[in-house]
């Protein structure tokens, strides 16, 4: 089993503003490239995938999106998180005709085939809790947001087939 530290302070964005979903995806993915978690191809791949298979989730009062791209574009697994000052419209995963005003984005980069299924399952348990999401939006500092996320993700299992490993 692999347990990874999936978070990097440089990939946590608090109270940011984006023009639209594509701007958010490009900005977050570019930060992943700059920190060598993903290949440059990840930027276009995550945008293309979002257009074809939307990731907006109607999770209640605070909507989220969980964009991701194929593992072949990833060097090392990570999660980038953005809390948005103003909502950005993402298409609903279950109804692509519907726009959702998203306030939280969890961008996934998974380096193992099929590992994203486990990560998505674990993440779904987190994003369905409105109090948890509100706590992320209310984080008063970048460091506080990072610590809250670190607590949330400390036991996320990425791949059940491998030996225990930690990377940062």
Regions picked out by a protein language model, each given a short descriptive name:
Residues 1-168:
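Cytosolic covalent-transfer regions centered on His/Cys nucleophiles
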């Amino acid at each position: 089993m692999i347990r990874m530290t999936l978070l990097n302070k440089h990939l946590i964005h608090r109270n940011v503003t984006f023009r639209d979903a594509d701007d958010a995806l490009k900005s977050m993915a570019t930060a992943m490239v700059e920190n060598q978690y993903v290949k440059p191809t990840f930027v276009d791949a995550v945008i293309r995938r979002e257009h074809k298979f939307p990731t907006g989730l109607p999770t209640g009062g605070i909507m989220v999106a969980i964009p991701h791209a194929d593992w072949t574009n990833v060097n090392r697994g990570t999660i980038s998180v953005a809390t948005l000052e103003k909502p950005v419209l993402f298409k609903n995963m279950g109804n692509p005709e519907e726009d959702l005003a998203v306030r939280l984005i969890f961008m996934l980069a998974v380096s193992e085939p099929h590992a994203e299924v486990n990560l998505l399952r674990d993440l779904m348990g987190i994003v369905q809790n409105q109090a948890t999401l509100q706590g992320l939006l209310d984080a008063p500092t970048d460091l506080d947001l990072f610590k809250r996320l670190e607590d949330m993700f400390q036991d996320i299992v990425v791949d059940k087939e491998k030996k225990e490993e930690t990377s940062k």
